[in-house]
Structure formats: structure tokens, C-alpha cells
């Protein structure tokens, strides 16, 4: 097969291509007008969204969900998510409604959960009926097996897979209306749903194949051939001094897409070819043979993969030149630049492409009001109007499946935002089942016999993390900061938010909902108001965000900020409105950072005791509220208020009563 070419084919035009791409990447086009893309779903108005949301998840009938009923039901929804119960469609409520989530209702729905059912046996079978083209079958199998193990680890339930016949849990992927009367809604929105234990559809779990299914951190691409066959692409990877976040044909004369399986290709030389129909197909009856172009189907010649003849939207091709004669076919694998949504049924991006007369060498948000990045799937959008959204981080099939299998065991949605069974999707890198989840499933089935310590044998059971309650517990916050006008309180993987001190903050919410790449626990946080960027510290690294987008190249070591190597942790940091400088505290010392010059000021560190009146060492947090003229230093359960101009302490108070509304 041609794909087994030696790596030397990369080198010839490499430098010319790289220089050309760099020059094109710096071309600046005039802002493009906002247009209507064919096949795009028009966003609902806030009122339309609310009526549909409350009908689907809170039982408010569409035909009678008038203003009075809507307001009452809206309060129930706000209470469920820990939002202020105003009954109004405020910004926080709309933001919550627009988040990706499970399709099961948040209040009792007897089609899904009649009479709190459970399985009457501990040996449960499951069968995977279909696969998503986003992941190779082995990765899908593993994700589902690990998701079921989440529940078998803490209960007597044991799961076994069958390949034929009727299983207790039938697992499948589908789009829109897929046969159970509960249609999906295209990309984002509803991710999956599952039915409670029982006969028929009981236990069945369905996943929306209009989503991009990954392991939560971008596309999972297993390479073929090369010198790293079967390994996974490493994104981004470094090649000839440039980072690539997707497969590329740069440097190749045959057009095949490739990637490095380590970060530094120049150093390690490990690579493979990305899935492509010219290399192989999946499923079907073509034994994995590559597509044969052109091929004939129903008398028509096709030069690319097609969805013709299918109702499920999957792209396929003939593996011989005449499908009508040989009936040999396979499904086209998703490439690392396959699109999601749009009107191209997953066809890959084509670069460069023309849009409104301008050429684009990469994905763009031009023409869109929602900021989503897209690409054309032909060389000229203006002529062909074929397009799709570019791949993002996608949704973790493991996490979504673990949630849905909780429903398949009989669990309903949890109001605990830290629980796996909370309805809104949030990616968690180091997943642990919460105490709320464990209590819920063990109420139905009891604990795992492997964790029984009554006889002194077996492992000691460990409780999952518990969601803190700020007014019932003495919480020492990891960080406090004013970000985009709101005050955020951080504790482990949770945050609380408010606009005004003394008002009880909204929460708890998961940190990952806003800043998904952060570790489970931070040490300090501040906002650089000049650039409106949030800076987070954890251990000997720091992260910089613009809104919810992590800046490229982060996290970075503290040393790149100008701190000495012996500083392994930052206690607190804040930007002082008095001089627009940032102060960073660690132990009994502090440093001053110039946000304009991007370097530490000379003459630091200094001792806290020598410069700050009555401020203790080893602080927990510092914040300077915009326009307030005061700075607040937090330690333990108390805080000290300093007047910015005189540096006099003007108040010593309780965090609970003065900041949390307790």
C-alpha cells in the first residue's frame, strides 16, 4: 500500500510549505458580515428556549406554559441548580439552560423512572449495538466498560457483555429521532439519555451521534502504519518549529494526513497516518479495504464518500469500482479534521477554501455571530455552500456513559453539582465518584461485597468527595477574586459567585464549568484588569485565561513569571488598583509584577511584615474590589480590610457573615 512510504517524502518541499503557511496565516482580512449558513439551526430566543427546557425537564406543558406557570416552574428549575429563585429569565438562568446536558428530566417522569425501579438481580448484561465513527471500536468498548465499572466498584452489581440477542442494557448511537420517541437535537444541547431498569427499553442507553465523542480532551486519533502503528496522535505536536493541533499533510507529496505520536517529532521521529478513506474503511463488508474512487452506485459515479442510500447520515464508499455489481462497501473513517454539524455529514475540512472572496488556511469564525469556528468542505464555499464546525474538545464518552448508566441502574438526577448524576456535563480529568452518587446507588443495591470490612478482610471502603456547604462548615477558601465584575470563591473543585458582598453567593458550581483545564485545587487567583485575563496558580505552575479559553502555551512554570525556583507555591495574588501592579504572596514574602512590562519589578521579594500593616504571613487570598478603594486580606475564617491610600486597617471581620450572607 502506498501509505507505507518512507518518511523521506516529507522533507522535499517542507520549508517552502511552512514559510508559505506562515505568510498566509498572518494575512489580515476585513471583518466579514454575519450570514445564514445552510443547514444551521437558528438559535432559539430566550423565551423559546425556556418553554422548551421547562417542558422537557420540568413537565411544564407547552400548550399551557403561560407566564404564571412559566414563572412558577422556572423557580423550581432555579432551585434545582442553586440559582437565585427569581422566576425571571436572568443571565445565569439562560446560561444554565444553554449548557450541554443529559436528556433525562430533572423531576420525576414516569416514562423514564416509574416508581423508582431497580434491577432485581446483580448480574447485568449489556450489548453495544452500534459505534460512533469519532472513535475506534476498541476505544468505545473500553469507555463503556470503564463507565460500568464506576458502579460495580461500589455495589454488588456485575456487568458482562454479550454480542448477540437481547441484553439488559442495549447501547447505541443515533441522531435526531432514533426510534424511541425522544429525539436528539443536533450538536450540543442533549448529549444522551437512558431508561430506568425494566423490560423492553428499560436500561437502554442512547448517545447523540451529532456530538463529537472523545475522551474529553480533543479528538482521539489512532494512527495506521508509519513507525507508530496503533498509537495515538499527540496534539499539539512540534514539527519544524511549528505546533500542529490536528493531522496535516504538510511536507508530503501524496496528500496523506499524518501526525506525530510524541510532542517533538524532530527529536523523536515517531509518526503514523491519520484515518482516511484512502487508507482503510470501517465496518461494512469490505474487510477494511480503502475506498475505490470513483465507484458506481445505482448507476451514478462517486468520487468521494457519500451518504446516499442511507437514512442515518453515515458516510460510506464502495471498496471496488462497482458497488452495483460487487456489493462491497465500508464506512469512511473520521479524520482529525472531520467536521461536526453543518451540512456536510462529517466530511473533512478542505484548506485553503474561499469564503466571501477571501482565502482561509485554517478554521475561522468569520461570518458567525456565536464565535464558533468552522470550515468549508470544498475549496469554495461561495460556490458550493458546504461547511461544518471544526472539531473542539468534544464530550468524554466515558463520563457521559457513566452518567447514563447511573440512570440505567435506577438513579435520577442529583442537585449536587459535584455528583456524576448532576444533569449538566462538565469534564473532569481525574474523575472520582462523589459521596452523593455512592449513597444513592448503595441505597438501591447495597455496598460492594469486596469492600466489606466486617470480617477484617478486603479493602477499606473510601467515601467519595463531599460537596461543601459554606454556611454549615468552616471553609478555608483556596482563592477569592473579582473576575469580570463578579466575586468568585474557590474551594477544591467548587466555586461560589456573587456580584455583591454580603449577598449569599450562587453555588456551589464546578470550577471546570468555567475553566475546564484547571486542576482540582488551586492555590491562588487574580484578574489582570488591564487585559481582562484571569490568572490561576497551582503548585509550581500558573494558567492564564481569556474568559473561559486557556491561553496558548499554558500552564507555565512559576519561574517564567520571574519567581525564583525555590518558590513552589503561591499563597495569594491580587492586582492593586492603587498602582496597577500585581502583588504575589508566598510564605512571609511578596513580589511585585509589572503587567505592562511583563516582568517582576526590581528590589523584590520583600517581607510582608515590613510593608503591609497588620497583614499575616501565609495568606489564603487577597482581593481589591473595583472602585471600592479598599483591599481585603483573607486568612482562615477572617479577613482584614485595608484602606488603599493610607494602608490603614479599617476592619477585622468574619468571612461568613460579611461575605457569604450566612
Swiss-Prot record:
Cofactor note: Binds 4 Ca(2+) ions per subunit. Binds 2 Zn(2+) ions per subunit.
Span list, region Required for inhibitor TIMP2 binding: 414-662
Propeptide feature: residues: 30-109
Annotated GO CC locations: extracellular matrix; extracellular space; nucleus; plasma membrane; sarcomere
EC number: 3.4.24.24
Reaction(s) catalysed (UniProt annotation): Cleavage of gelatin type I and collagen types IV, V, VII, X. Cleaves the collagen-like sequence Pro-Gln-Gly-|-Ile-Ala-Gly-Gln
Binding-site residues for Ca(2+) 3, renumbered to this chain: 185-186, 208, 211
Location of the motif Cysteine switch: 100-107
Native organism taxonomy: Eukaryota, Metazoa, Chordata, Craniata, Vertebrata
Top-level taxon in the UniProt lineage: Eukaryota
Disulfide bridge map: 233-259, 247-274, 291-317, 305-332, 349-375, 363-390, 471-662
Gene expressing this chain: Mmp2
Glycan-linked positions: 575, 644
Ubl conjugation as UniProt keyword: no
Signal peptide (from-to): 1-29
SMART domains: FN2 (SM00059), HX (SM00120), ZnMc (SM00235)
Cofactor annotation: Ca(2+); Zn(2+)
Binding sites annotated in the UniProt record for Zn(2+) 1: 102, 403, 407, 413
Protein name stated in the entry: 72 kDa type IV collagenase
Record comment regarding domains: The conserved cysteine present in the cysteine-switch motif binds the catalytic zinc ion, thus inhibiting the enzyme. The dissociation of the cysteine from the zinc ion upon the activation-peptide release activates the enzyme.
Amino acid at each position: 500500500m502506498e501509505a507505507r512510504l518512507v518518511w523521506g517524502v516529507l522533507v522535499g518541499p517542507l520549508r517552502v510549505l511552512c514559510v508559505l503557511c506562515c505568510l498566509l496565516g498572518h494575512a489580515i482580512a476585513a471583518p466579514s458580515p454575519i450570514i445564514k449558513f445552510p443547514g444551521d439551526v437558528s438559535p432559539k430566543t430566550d423565551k423559546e428556549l425556556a418553554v422548551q427546557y421547562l417542558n422537557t425537564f420540568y413537565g411544564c406543558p407547552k400548550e399551557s406554559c403561560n407566564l404564571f406557570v412559566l414563572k412558577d416552574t422556572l423557580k423550581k428549575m432555579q432551585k434545582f441548580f442553586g440559582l437565585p429563585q427569581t422566576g425571571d429569565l436572568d443571565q445565569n438562568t439562560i446560561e444554565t439552560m444553554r449548557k450541554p446536558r443529559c436528556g433525562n428530566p430533572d423531576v420525576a417522569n414516569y416514562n423514564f423512572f416509574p416508581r423508582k425501579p431497580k434491577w432485581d438481580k446483580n448480574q447485568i448484561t449489556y450489548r453495544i449495538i452500534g459505534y460512533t465513527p469519532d472513535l475506534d471500536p476498541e476505544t468505545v468498548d473500553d469507555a463503556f466498560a470503564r463507565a460500568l465499572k464506576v458502579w460495580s466498584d461500589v455495589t454488588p452489581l456485575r456487568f458482562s457483555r454479550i454480542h448477540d440477542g437481547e441484553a439488559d442494557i442495549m447501547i447505541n448511537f443515533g441522531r435526531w429521532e432514533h426510534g424511541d420517541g425522544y429525539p436528539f437535537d443536533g450538536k450540543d444541547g442533549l448529549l444522551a439519555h437512558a431508561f430506568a431498569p425494566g423490560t423492553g427499553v428499560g436500561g437502554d442507553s442512547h448517545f447523540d451521534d451529532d456530538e463529537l465523542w472523545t475522551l474529553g480532551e480533543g479528538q482521539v486519533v489512532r494512527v495506521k502504519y508509519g513507525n507508530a502503528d496503533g498509537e495515538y496522535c499527540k496534539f499539539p505536536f512540534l514539527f519544524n518549529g511549528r505546533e500542529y493541533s490536528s493531522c496535516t499533510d504538510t511536507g508530503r507529496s501524496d496528500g496523506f494526513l499524518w501526525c506525530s505520536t510524541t510532542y517533538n517529532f524532530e527529536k523523536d521521529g515517531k509518526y503514523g497516518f491519520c484515518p482516511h478513506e484512502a487508507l482503510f474503511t470501517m465496518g461494512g463488508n469490505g474487510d477494511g479495504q480503502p475506498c475505490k474512487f470513483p465507484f458506481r452506485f445505482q448507476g451514478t459515479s462517486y468520487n468521494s464518500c457519500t451518504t446516499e442510500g442511507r437514512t442515518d447520515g453515515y458516510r460510506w464508499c464502495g471498496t471496488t469500482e462497482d458497488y452495483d455489481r460487487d456489493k462491497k462497501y465500508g464506512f469512511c473513517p473520521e479524520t482529525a479534521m472531520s467536521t461536526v454539524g453543518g451540512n456536510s455529514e462529517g466530511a473533512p475540512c478542505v484548506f485553503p477554501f474561499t469564503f466571501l472572496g477571501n482565502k482561509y488556511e485554517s478554521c475561522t469564525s468569520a461570518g458567525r455571530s456565536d464565535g464558533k469556528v468552522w470550515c468549508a468542505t470544498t475549496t469554495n464555499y461561495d460556490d458550493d455552500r458546504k461547511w461544518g464546525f471544526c472539531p473542539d474538545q468534544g464530550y468524554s464518552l466515558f463520563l457521559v456513559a457513566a452518567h447514563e448508566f447511573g440512570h440505567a441502574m435506577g438513579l435520577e438526577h442529583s442537585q449536587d453539582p459535584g455528583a456524576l448524576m448532576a444533569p449538566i456535563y462538565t469534564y473532569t480529568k481525574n474523575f472520582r465518584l462523589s459521596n452523593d452518587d455512592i449513597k444513592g446507588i448503595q441505597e438501591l443495591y447495597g455496598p460492594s461485597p469486596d469492600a466489606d470490612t466486617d470480617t477484617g478482610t478486603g479493602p477499606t471502603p473510601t467515601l467519595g468527595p463531599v460537596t461543601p456547604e459554606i454556611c454549615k462548615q468552616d471553609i478555608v477558601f483556596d482563592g477569592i477574586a473579582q473576575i469580570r465584575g463578579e466575586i468568585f470563591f474557590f474551594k477544591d473543585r467548587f466555586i461560589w459567585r456573587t456580584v455583591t458582598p454580603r449577598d449569599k453567593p450562587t453555588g456551589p458550581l464546578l470550577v471546570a464549568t468555567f475553566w475546564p483545564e484547571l486542576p482540582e485545587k488551586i492555590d491562588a487567583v487574580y484578574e489582570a484588569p488591564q487585559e481582562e485575563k484571569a490568572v490561576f496558580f497551582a503548585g509550581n505552575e500558573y494558567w492564564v485565561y481569556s474568559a473561559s479559553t486557556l491561553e496558548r502555551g499554558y500552564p507555565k512554570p512559576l519561574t517564567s513569571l520571574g519567581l525564583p525556583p525555590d518558590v513552589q507555591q503561591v499563597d495569594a495574588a491580587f492586582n492593586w488598583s492603587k498602582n496597577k501592579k500585581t502583588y504575589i504572596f508566598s510564605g512571609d514574602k511578596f513580589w511585585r509584577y509589572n503587567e505592562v512590562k511583563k516582568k517582576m519589578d526590581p528590589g523584590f521579594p520583600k517581607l510582608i511584615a515590613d510593608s503591609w500593616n497588620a497583614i499575616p504571613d501565609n495568606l489564603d487570598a487577597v482581593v481589591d474590589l473595583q472602585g471600592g478603594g479598599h483591599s481585603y486580606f483573607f486568612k482562615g475564617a477572617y479577613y482584614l480590610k485595608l484602606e488603599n491610600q493610607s494602608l490603614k486597617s479599617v476592619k477585622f471581620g468574619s468571612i461568613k457573615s460579611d461575605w457569604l450572607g450566612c
